[in-house]
Structures are given as structure tokens and as C-alpha cells.
């Protein structure tokens, strides 16, 4: 048996749902999708869900992951085994841990390949900071996986599809985190997973102010702007959602233009599936040139304006 009888899908990030649903179609005979509202439920059915389970009734001061108890109960009530697919977001991983505990299931994070053999999931993901690929065969009846971005192609919606909708009512867990305040995230919404052209900046750009040079290039060629982890996590020059690497975005654009990025393996595992890699770096020995199809050795601050002017003609 090379498929599960049932798969359960949930995504806290709407843009990740289509790829999870495509993976679900390949891995199981029946697709169940947990959603938070009616609009997400309608989308899930168009993407292939046979059953939609609307999570309902959570108080405003409680966290989404507090639904883990009723989600696990619902999963157990509809089969003695199954596969759970979640995005490898922070919330996805937290929810995976809670579901794993309640389902007595093995949990595997950041899966880049998933297959089913004899009714059991086999998972591959990066280990040792991206230096190797590890393979795990999950022996527990339930398997809970968080999936790396780009592991599956996005499913295409079909408005003619039909499915059943159910409601799962909130039940307060015995121990829970209460949210006391919410601060709006200062971020420009962008779906880098779908970008054809990506310009990505590293610390070699020199300063936060110099990122404007990369933004001008993006505008000239219709690209999206990304960055390396140090730019987002250490320097705080850009949003966390834009950094490319093993623990975040795994991109497959037609063009990946790396500006001032050294090319460490932890970054490149998120970019080396690009059709073409173009690197700009003032260090001729930078590892990025081992991956690049094309490269320029020089100061990005001087090269970017000239490149933008040439491509804008």
C-alpha cells in the first residue's frame, strides 16, 4: 500500500495550503482539511478536500494551537492511522508537537520529500545544518509532518469540486497560553514561493539603506526581494518572512540574483533549485560562485545601479 487511507491538512498560512493539498492528493485516498473560516473551507474543497472541518469558537485571547486537543480527537474518531501535513512555520511546528503528543505519533519537521511504503511514511529532510540529507521511516500509526516550502507544487483550484463541511467546536485545554496583547506585524505581504525572479541580498550589501538599490533593480525587472538569514535575524534589516535558507524559504524561481551573499550551504539549500543563479560579490573566493551560473566580482553598491540602468532600457 503506497498511500494512507486518510490525510489531515492544516495551514496557518493561506498561501501554503495549495502545495499541502497537492501533496495530500499524492499521499492519501481521502483528504480532510481543518480550516478557520468559511472562505478557507471553500478554497480547500476547490483544492481537493473531501471533508472540511471548520474549527469554531476559540476565544480571542487563546492561541490557534489550543485547537490541538479537538483536532486530535477528530483525527482519532475517523481512523486508527493517518497522515497529518502542516507547513513548517513556527505555528505549524508548535501544533505538530502538540498533535504528536496527543496522537502518540512520531513528528518529523522540515520534510523535503515524502513517500509512503507499506502504509508507513518515509521522510527526507536536511540534517547537520544542510550538510546532509537524513531519511526517516515513521513506524507509528499516525505520522505528523511539517513540510518545507516548495516540497510540492501548488494544487490548482477546481470550482466544480464538491465536499462535505463539518464543524469542530472549541474545547478549552487543561493547560493553555492566554494571549494578553497583539501587535500588528510590520511586513509587506509577498508570496516569494510564486516569484519567477528573485533578487536576494546578504550582509555584503553593506547597510540597510543600500537595500534600496536592490529594490530599484526589483522594480526594473519585476522581481521580488528576498534576503539571507543574517540580514533578517541578526541585522534586522528585513522581515523574517523574506529570508531564504534551510530553516525558512526554499525557492525555485527562474532567476535567483544573489547580491552580497557569501553562499553558505544553509542558505544555498533554499536557493539551489533555481533555474539560473546569478551572483554579485566582491570576494572572488566566495562559495556562492560554486553554485552560480553567472557571476560578477565587484562591489554591489556600484554594480547594482549600473545593472538597473542597463536592464531598465
Swiss-Prot record:
The beginning of the lineage is:
Bacteria, Pseudomonadati, Pseudomonadota, Gammaproteobacteria, Enterobacterales
Domain of life of the native organism: Bacteria
A family per Pfam = ETF
- Residue positions annotated to bind FAD are 255-283
- Molecular-function GO term, any one: flavin adenine dinucleotide binding
| Functional note | Required for anaerobic carnitine reduction. May bring reductant to CaiA.
The cross-references to PANTHER family, in alphabetical order and at most eight, read:
ELECTRON TRANSFER FLAVOPROTEIN ALPHA (PTHR43153), PROTEIN FIXB-RELATED (PTHR43153:SF5)
Self-association state and partner proteins as the record states: Heterodimer of FixA and FixB.
Q: In which pathway does it act?
A: Amine and polyamine metabolism; carnitine metabolism
Q: According to the UniProt record, which cysteines are disulfide-bonded?
A: none
Cite the SMART domains for this sequence.
Answer: ETF
**Name assigned to this protein:** Protein FixB
Q: Which UniProt keywords apply?
A: Electron transport, FAD, Flavoprotein, Transport
User: Could you tell me the Gene Ontology terms of the biological process aspect for this record?
Assistant: carnitine catabolic process; carnitine metabolic process; fatty acid beta-oxidation using acyl-CoA dehydrogenase
Give the family from UniProt.
Belongs to the ETF alpha-subunit/FixB family.
Amino acid at each position: 500500500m503506497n498511500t494512507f487511507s486518510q490525510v489531515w491538512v492544516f495551514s496557518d498560512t493561506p498561501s501554503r495550503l495549495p502545495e499541502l493539498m497537492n501533496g495530500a492528493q499524492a499521499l492519501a485516498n481521502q483528504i480532510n482539511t481543518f480550516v478557520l473560516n468559511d472562505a478557507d473551507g471553500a478554497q480547500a474543497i476547490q483544492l481537493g478536500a473531501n471533508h472540511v472541518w471548520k474549527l469554531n469558537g476559540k476565544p480571542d485571547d487563546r492561541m490557534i494551537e489550543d485547537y490541538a486537543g479537538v483536532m486530535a480527537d477528530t483525527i482519532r474518531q475517523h481512523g486508527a492511522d493517518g497522515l497529518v501535513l502542516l507547513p513548517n512555520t513556527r505555528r505549524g511546528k508548535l501544533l505538530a508537537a502538540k498533535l504528536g503528543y496527543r496522537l502518540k505519533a512520531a513528528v518529523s519537521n522540515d520534510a523535503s520529500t515524502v513517500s509512503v511504503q507499506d502504509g508507513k511514511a518515509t521522510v527526507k529532510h536536511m540534517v547537520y545544518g544542510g550538510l546532509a540529507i537524513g531519511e526517516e521511516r515513521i513506524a507509528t500509526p499516525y505520522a505528523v509532518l511539517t513540510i518545507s516550502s516548495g516540497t510540492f507544487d501548488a494544487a490548482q483550484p477546481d470550482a466544480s469540486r464538491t465536499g462535505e463541511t463539518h464543524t469542530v467546536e472549541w474545547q478549552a485545554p487543561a493547560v493553555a497560553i492566554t494571549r494578553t496583547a497583539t501587535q500588528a506585524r510590520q511586513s509587506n505581504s509577498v508570496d516569494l514561493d510564486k516569484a519567477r525572479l528573485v533578487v536576494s541580498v546578504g550582509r555584503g550589501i553593506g547597510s540597510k539603506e543600500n537595500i534600496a538599490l536592490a529594490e530599484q533593480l526589483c522594480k526594473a525587472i519585476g522581481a521580488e526581494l528576498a534576503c539571507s538569514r543574517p540580514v533578517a535575524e541578526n541585522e534586522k534589516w528585513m522581515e523574517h518572512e523574506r529570508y531564504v535558507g534551510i530553516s525558512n524559504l526554499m525557492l525555485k524561481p527562474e532567476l535567483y540574483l544573489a547580491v552580497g551573499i557569501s553562499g553558505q550551504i544553509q542558505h544555498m539549500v533554499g536557493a539551489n533549485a533555481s533555474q539560473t543563479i546569478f551572483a554579485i560579490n566582491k570576494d572572488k573566493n566566495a562559495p556562492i560562485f560554486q553554485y552560480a551560473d553567472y557571476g560578477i566580482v565587484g562591489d554591489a553598491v556600484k554594480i547594482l545601479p549600473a545593472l538597473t540602468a542597463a536592464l531598465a532600457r
